[in-house]
Amino acid sequence: MALPSLHEFPWLTTVIAYPVLAALFIPLIPAPAGDPSTRAYAQKLAERIRWFALFIAVTDLLILLAGFYVGYDPGQTGLQLLERYTWVPQVGLSWSVGADGLSMPLILLTAFITTLAILAAWPVTLKPRLFYFLMLAMYGGQIGVFAVQDMLLFFLMWELELIPVYLLLSIWGGANRLYAATKFILYTALSSLFILVAGLAMAFYGDPISFDMTDLAHKTYPLTFQLLMYGAFLIAYGVKLPIFPLHTWLPDAHGEATAPVHMLLAGILLKMGGYALMRMNAGMLPDAHLYFAPVLIVLGVVNIIFAALTSFAQRNLKRKIACSSISHMGFVLIGIGSLTEIGMSGAMLQMISHGLIGASLFFLVGATYDRTHTLELEEMGGVGLKMPKIFSMFTACSLASLALPGMSGFVAEIMVFIGMATTDAYSLPFRLVVVFLAAVGVILTPIYLLSMLRQIFFGPENKELTEHEELVDAEPREVFIIACLLIPIIGIGLYPKLVTSLYDQSTNALVALLRQELPQTGETVAQAPALYNN
């Protein structure tokens, strides 16, 4: 019997299933000898488990890179690495996975960030079996969200990812972890019902009855139906992005999470909302998107300004960075709503860029907290001389967050600005107002970020803190993690085509789909209702 070729190998199924199945073996890892009640025993047990988890994460990343090299062509617009297997034929559920330019960059980002998050979790000794089981299960679930091509399967993956986050927050979080975890699960679980209801409605509308995303995208829906489905999806994905006013779970979750969970929340979780808006709202419901596009832009501007202003008022370091994340995701909304190739490309690049920058900042917040045991900015100060490496890394990552030229955030935001300024889908006054307000948000960002750096590292010295023996500089593991994140941040900033070439064909095809009517009529989006009165 001939072995399947590398092109026929189930790469994506393997990448999704491998960490989940490997996690099931964690309870079988033998415990070390000694007294289970001692700290030394807990450290030895955690060390065995963390090395196993890191090995699984690294090998899964290598498998993904091999599949990317063998079977993915960035020049194509359609789905690649496609696999379809009948799973539950009674309800029309199939195991269908594939990747294109909208999903492959985010799949790669997920594998990369999760591997670093597991390395960042090195100090965790509380219930290590459960902790690393959840981390690996979340690894597979998050890749599944970006890879699956079946609506029911997408919903299952979306829900699978929620449970590990809830447990990681509620068990390993801070003092208010139960409140934050409960708020997270209520927001996300309730909003997920909109995905299920809208997905079922689209599947059972017309013929054929199908949950396959390709079939759903090719169905013809009346405008009213599209608008209802679009609104339902927008609520669900707006919680995850997050969009104001559905954002309030995020500062609480970040305020209580540990460093590795921070990295997953900021680096991957928020991107699920942006990806779904592109894939389902814009890709499956293009007519409705013309109506909602200006709404997305307005919401994006509100995100940028409101979150930037809120960040000024925050005195908690984690919450301040969380608010900056909300602000940065506003550019994703503007890019998606711009209806231009460069704007849509900028939105995708902003998701990738923020994934790297957000993960780096929150990791450094965790590293700083491990040494200072406080998150209140008033209690910090003068620690820069004692921690020069952490100060240098924090400064570099903060400069990336404020979109310094030469770093990825600058390129992404400039692309969104150009897309919004040059689009012919909106009137000139609307474009000018949006660009001006977004620019105000960009100006506010360095003010609160640089002020934060000054307060932490060079503010009035807290001698009780600076003279504490635990206040030590970064260790090699921490320097390695930040270096792994800064290299692509700077690399993308200097040569963005390194990443944009992975998805430009897909984002351009999506924009072409959305603009089919506009070039023919010369109408702006504000006049879009006339397009559907024929």
Curated annotation (Swiss-Prot):
Q: Which InterPro entries does this one have?
A: NADH_Q_OxRdtase_chain4 (IPR022997), NADH_Q_OxRdtase_chainM/4 (IPR010227), NADH_UbQ_OxRdtase (IPR003918), ND/Mrp_TM (IPR001750)
What reactions does this protein catalyze? a plastoquinone + NADH + (n+1) H(+)(in) = a plastoquinol + NAD(+) + n H(+)(out); a plastoquinone + NADPH + (n+1) H(+)(in) = a plastoquinol + NADP(+) + n H(+)(out)
Q: Give the EC number(s) listed in the UniProt record.
A: 7.1.1.-
Q: Where in the cell is it found?
A: Cellular thylakoid membrane
Q: Which GO terms describe its molecular function?
A: NADH dehydrogenase (ubiquinone) activity; ubiquinone binding
Major site of localization recorded for this protein:
membrane
Which positions, given as ranges, span the membrane? 9-29, 51-71, 106-126, 130-150, 152-172, 184-204, 227-247, 258-278, 290-310, 326-346, 347-367, 399-419, 432-452, 479-499
Task: For this entry, list what GO says about its biological process.
Answer: ATP synthesis coupled electron transport; electron transport coupled proton transport
What cellular-component terms does GO give this entry? plasma membrane-derived thylakoid membrane
| Pfam (any one) | Proton_antipo_M
Tell me which domain of life the UniProt entry assigns to the organism this sequence originates from: Bacteria
Which UniProt keywords are present, listed alphabetically? Membrane, NAD, NADP, Plastoquinone, Quinone, Thylakoid, Translocase, Transmembrane, Transmembrane helix
Identify its membrane topology class. Answer: Multi-pass membrane protein
PANTHER family per UniProt: NAD(P)H-QUINONE OXIDOREDUCTASE CHAIN 4, CHLOROPLASTIC, NADH-UBIQUINONE OXIDOREDUCTASE CHAIN 4
Described function: NDH-1 shuttles electrons from NAD(P)H, via FMN and iron-sulfur (Fe-S) centers, to quinones in the respiratory chain. The immediate electron acceptor for the enzyme in this species is believed to be plastoquinone. Couples the redox reaction to proton translocation (for every two electrons transferred, four hydrogen ions are translocated across the cytoplasmic membrane), and thus conserves the redox energy in a proton gradient.
The family classification in the record reads:
Belongs to the complex I subunit 4 family.
Q: What is this protein called?
A: NAD(P)H-quinone oxidoreductase chain 4 2
Give the species this sequence originates from.
Answer: Synechococcus sp. (strain JA-2-3B'a(2-13)) (Cyanobacteria bacterium Yellowstone B-Prime)
Organism lineage string: Bacteria, Bacillati, Cyanobacteriota, Cyanophyceae, Synechococcales
